[in-house]
């Protein structure tokens, strides 16, 4: 079955920032490069390990989302974004774009919503979908062909499917994760839960009664003070569910040509990795030896891309593997917007890339990374 990988950029960016906080990596200019290194390595490892047929990296847009409009206190409790993250994000984007991996960004919607919509459509199109994120709210999207893909330890991976959701929450229907979160609340997003109800109680209530709506209808049948508190919370509980629900109707089309990855722009990557002092990645690029010239991917555009879409499928092996290039059968180029007129997503995509990367020798920089990344699980 073909595989679609969708990466929640900011979820990983914050995770790597805090994982490396005690001993950050820095380049010769003194810049904290931990986030960029961790993100790049994990993205590279996904390509090496999984060979995704389709791949996209979703970013939260500037200006917030519709959730702030319906609940002004949404995420209002968060401290200012650390300066090291603010400095790292542009580099992460530049590297993703130079790798010619599609960048997904829709005004008014968070990355969760973009990923949720594309994951839903991807499953309908017959793909095995993997959502690359450590965030628990993605559990509501899990189904037979849609799973959470998480880093575990240094090089380990945890796949969260139906069984894992069942074991964690005691529910058969993963969609009910949003109801558990609504009852419990989400402190990181400043979504208040019902007073006195924690995770365990929320799970028990949902196991017995199902959705938040049904729980409210039967609040008078719930023993002790819990039923009274739930009834009093009323509209706040319904609002919390709306806030914790990941959208599946973001105005973005699912088209394979919009989520394919073309040949990386090697010169750009070399310049970026040299500036960041990423010797391990520079060595990989130096040893890249395609059998024939590869087409360069398109430059990104903040207003979207239009024009013809065509391409070839390349299998690129790094040192230690056979270098070969294969031509795939591709339908005639299509002309027009990469997205429908209603979609405001930015996407960089032309042709598919399956990348296998050779294991690099252990360097002091990698040793620091290995020591820090153990905290990620």
Which residues does each PLM region occupy?
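Non-catalytic, usually N-terminal nucleic-acid engagement modules in DNA/RNA processing proteins
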Residues: 1-56, 60, 66-71
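Short hydrophobic beta-strand that contains or immediately precedes a catalytic carboxylate
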Residues: 6-7, 133, 377
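Long, highly charged low-complexity segments
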Residues: 255, 259, 264-314
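Low-acidity, Ser/Thr- and Arg-rich intrinsically disordered low-complexity segments
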Residues: 299-302, 308-321, 325-377
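Basic, polar low-complexity surface loops/patches
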Residues: 6, 32-36, 47-50, 88-99, ...
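Structured, non-catalytic alpha/beta "coupling" segments that mediate domain-domain communication
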Residues: 47-58, 128-140, 144, 148-151, ...
